Amino acid sequence: MDLKNFDISNGEAGIELTILDLDNKPTDIKIKLLCLHGKKGRAALINLVKNDKASTAHILAALTTGWSGIAQDGKELKFSPEAAEKLYEGYPIIAAQVEKFIEDARNFLKK
């Protein structure tokens, strides 16, 4: 088997996930994520563990590099690591989709 079948280097720049609504239909929400299995993802995880901040929301926020299409009270919600952590803590349906996406290395394979 060719090693290119294991190349997750796309995850170093981040891959965009489209969030689904409760009917499993795509929304306008796009979240850019690092691969948990890549160098940057592992470094972020190690840093969180060292600083004793290993909650799920912290981990997901550390692997999030940006987003679009998210509004709160009719205003665009600007990305920041702190805003990402609050998003994941307050909206478990979004957090669950992000968690499932980053756990699957196939989402980051180079095509």
Language model: regions and residue ranges:
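Short, intrinsically disordered N-terminal pre-domain segments
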Residues: 1-12
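Short, surface-exposed, charged amphipathic helix/loop patches that serve as local interaction elements
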Residues: 23-111
